[in-house]
Each structure stands twice: as structure tokens, then as C-alpha cells.
């Protein structure tokens, strides 16, 4: 008789604890769950969002659920209107969306105006490299002229800016290549695998690149990292900067390779309550050691990168309060914040 009684007592105790935690969370104004939007499965951002969601769910007092989307253009409107709370995306896309269609890069800004996005934490830089088949004669970006080159990226517009930045580093334009239209970065890799394209791109160490390497063998090729190439890249896409990556730990990198890098943002909607943002930020802030094993990019997702004077969108008030309490909101950041808020008064 004692075992059933003990089992029943254990169940009652667990239910009581769960109810207590839920009541405590509700008392703090926290929801039962929130969503975090990101790119499709197989992308680096999906892996990052999954890691963030795991840590937040374990430490914020509520569950965070990952909601993948085709790309920035489909995800941002949901956060802007409050249908989704959080997102993982790059600072360049957010710069364009926050400022609206009048602000363009390469003559383009197809993002819907998204004035209600707010930065929670600047994370690690995303590194994106041009990708070819392993047996391709193409060695660097200077060899892509006249080649079949994935473009358009109708559902994943960051891909268009990536490719524009790669080309610009070499002083090339879209007119110098044969554009193969694709919808997403994953579709671009599929075009390479199906021999419909000679050159595509993807984030370094993504699941999709690993899949392609296992299927046919692929390698990343270098952009132009000379001082002139760097200047052309930065002028073409503000927020981009070159990175040299070495062979060894990254799939498809067989020699020192120059790639595009740009910052990743954990962000939220303007209407998300301060305490919800602070709870998520606290969990990520204190959970860095849990993040590192999930994906190599989390090695650079550090506390000292969180507050950035070159941020492309304003910080969420909950994040500002969090950083001020920890004395990491540096002198001059209030002026940066006011300048960014003034873009959409």
C-alpha cells in the first residue's frame, strides 16, 4: 500500500509546484508562453533561435516556442503588429525595415515599414560565404563573372543583399553574372546540388551546407578582402564587414577564406511588456555556458557585445533598464537611443 500512496504524494507535490511556479509567473506579469520567429529549419538562425528558446524556457518563467518563417519579409510584419513577441534576425534587414522603403541598399528595400521593432541584445556576427561544388574551377569571387549565380531571393531578401555584397567586394554587379532566381537561401543550395547554378551562398556551418557537403562535396570561396574590396563591401551594404576564416572546424572551408560578416539581433516587438523582455534577457545573459554547446556561433554571443553604439534599431525599454542596472549601458547610449527613436516619432 505504501508505494501507491508515495506515488500519489509525489504526483500531488509536482502538480503543486507547477501551479506555484505558474502563479508566480502570472503574478510577475509573465505569460505562459511566447513565440520567437526566425528563418527556416536548416539555417543557422533557426539553430540560434532554438538555443535561445531552450535557455529562455528554462530560466525566464515562461516557455518560448520557435516559429520558423521563409525569411525576414514574412516574419517582421507579425512582430510589428504584436502577433509574435520575439525574433532572431540580422541588423541590416532590421535597419531597412525600421526606416522604411525610402531607405535603400543597392537600389532596393522591399521590406514593409516596421517601426515597432526593438533590440533586446546584439548577438554574434553571422558569417556568410559564397559556395561552389568542391570540384568547381571557381576559386574566388573574381571568377564568378559570366557564371550562373543565385539571386532574387524573393522570400529571403537578406540573401539578395548577401550576394550584392559579395559581388560588390570584387567591383562586380548583377549584370556581370547569369542570375538564377531562387526564393530562399536553402533553395539556392538546392540549385547548386541540382546543377542549375554554379555559385550560391549560405551561412557558415549551417545544417544545409553540411547536407550539401555530404551529398556532392562543396567549398566556400573568398570575397575580396583587400582594403579596396573591404571598402567596396562596406559602401555597398552598411553593416557588413569582412572576416577571414581558417580551415579546420568549418564545413566547406578548405583554406583561409574571406566571407561577409554582420551582426545578429535578438529583438522584440515594441508592445512586449518590459518584464517579459527582462526575463528573457536575464535568462540569456546568465545562460551563456548553456548556449555554447548548441552552436559554434554562440561562442561570440557574449555579454560585452550586447550593447552597441552602432545599433540599427532602438533598444527595448526593458532591455535598457536591464543594462543600466548592470552598468553596461555606456555613456552616450541615451543619445544613440533618442536618435534611433526619432526615426519613427
Where are each of the predicted segments found?
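Bilobed "Venus flytrap"/periplasmic-binding protein-like clamshell domains
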Residues: 31-65, 126-194, 308-318, 322
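N-terminal secretory/targeting leader peptides
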Residues: 34-37, 41-45, 53-74, 81-84, ...
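An extracytoplasmic/periplasmic, membrane-proximal ligand-sensing/linker region
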Residues: 204, 208-225, 232-234, 275-279, ...
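Short, low-complexity disordered leader/linker segments with a strong preference
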Residues: 1-31, 345
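Ligand-binding clefts/hinges and TM-proximal coupling segments of bilobed small-molecule sensing domains
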Residues: 145-165, 239-300, 305
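N-terminal segment of the mature folded domain
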Residues: 80-120
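Sec/Tat-exported extracytoplasmic proteins
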Residues: 56-60, 83, 88-91, 98-101, ...
Amino acid at each position: 500500500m505504501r508505494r501507491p500512496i508515495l506515488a500519489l504524494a509525489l504526483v500531488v507535490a509536482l502538480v503543486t509546484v507547477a501551479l506555484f511556479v505558474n502563479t508566480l509567473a502570472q503574478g510577475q506579469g509573465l505569460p505562459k508562453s511566447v513565440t520567437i520567429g526566425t528563418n527556416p529549419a536548416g539555417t543557422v538562425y533557426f539553430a540560434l533561435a532554438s538555443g535561445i528558446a531552450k535557455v529562455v524556457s528554462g530560466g525566464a518563467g515562461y516557455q518560448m516556442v520557435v516559429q520558423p518563417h521563409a525569411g525576414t519579409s514574412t516574419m517582421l510584419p507579425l512582430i510589428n503588429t504584436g502577433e509574435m513577441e520575439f525574433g532572431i534576425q540580422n541588423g541590416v534587414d532590421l535597419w531597412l525595415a525600421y526606416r522604411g522603403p525610402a531607405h535603400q541598399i543597392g537600389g532596393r528595400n522591399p521590406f514593409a515599414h516596421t517601426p515597432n521593432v526593438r533590440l533586446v541584445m546584439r548577438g554574434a556576427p553571422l558569417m556568410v560565404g559564397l559556395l561552389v561544388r568542391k570540384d568547381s574551377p571557381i576559386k574566388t569571387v573574381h571568377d564568378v563573372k559570366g557564371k550562373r549565380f543565385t539571386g532574387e531571393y524573393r522570400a529571403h531578401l537578406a540573401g539578395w543583399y548577401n550576394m550584392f555584397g559579395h559581388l560588390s567586394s570584387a567591383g562586380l554587379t548583377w549584370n556581370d553574372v547569369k542570375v538564377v532566381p531562387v526564393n530562399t537561401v536553402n533553395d539556392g543550395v538546392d540549385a547548386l546540388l541540382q546543377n542549375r547554378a554554379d555559385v550560391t551562398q549560405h551561412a557558415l556551418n549551417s545544417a544545409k551546407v553540411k547536407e550539401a557537403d555530404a551529398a556532392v562535396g562543396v567549398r566556400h570561396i573568398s570575397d575580396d578582402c583587400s582594403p579596396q574590396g573591404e571598402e567596396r563591401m562596406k559602401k555597398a551594404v552598411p553593416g557588413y564587414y569582412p572576416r577571414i576564416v581558417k580551415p579546420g572546424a568549418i564545413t566547406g572551408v578548405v583554406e583561409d577564406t574571406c566571407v561577409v560578416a554582420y551582426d545578429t539581433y535578438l529583438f522584440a516587438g515594441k508592445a512586449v511588456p518590459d518584464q517579459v523582455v527582462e526575463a528573457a534577457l536575464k535568462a540569456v545573459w546568465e545562460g551563456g555556458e548553456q548556449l555554447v554547446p548548441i552552436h559554434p556561433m554562440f561562442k561570440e554571443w557574449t555579454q560585452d557585445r550586447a550593447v552597441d553604439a552602432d545599433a540599427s534599431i532602438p533598444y527595448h525599454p526593458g532591455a535598457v533598464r536591464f543594462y543600466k542596472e548592470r552598468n553596461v549601458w555606456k555613456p552616450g547610449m541615451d543619445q544613440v537611443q533618442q536618435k534611433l527613436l526619432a526615426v519613427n516619432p
